[in-house]
Amino acid sequence: MTRVPRGYIARRRRAKMRSFASNFRGAHLRLNRMITQQVRRAFVSSHRDRVRQKRDFRRLWISRINAATRIHKVFDNYSKLIHNLYKKELILNRKILAQVAVLNPNNLYTISNKIKIIN
């Protein structure tokens, strides 16, 4: 039985997968079946970790704000600060508040004074 040369579509698909696996080692770089498995696994991990990264950074920002509010005695804790911010309609997200709390605590005092003055 003669060998039938296949078209270029499968080669293109495998070359694309191989380009994703260019930094892998051993059989994960050389064998097509292993390449497809490992690339699929890498994509799943990267998607999962992108979602997890958002969660982890939010937790980090909250813990930084909480620590700064307790150390500098701005409020009793994080939840009271956030509650008063929402109550007074001051729109500051947790990332910005965490940067302010770490880099310039004096601005944290001014924010808390704004909240208390509006009361």
Swiss-Prot record:
GO terms for cellular component: chloroplast; plastid; ribonucleoprotein complex; ribosome. Its main location: plastid. GO terms for molecular function: rRNA binding; structural constituent of ribosome. Keywords: Chloroplast, Plastid, Ribonucleoprotein, Ribosomal protein, RNA-binding, rRNA-binding. Pfam families: Ribosomal_L20. GO terms for biological process: ribosomal large subunit assembly; translation. The keyword Chloroplast applies. It comes from the Eukaryota. It is found in: Plastid, Chloroplast. Binds directly to 23S ribosomal RNA and is necessary for the in vitro assembly process of the 50S ribosomal subunit. It is not involved in the protein synthesizing functions of that subunit. Belongs to the bacterial ribosomal protein bL20 family. This is Large ribosomal subunit protein bL20c. It comes from Oryza sativa subsp. indica.
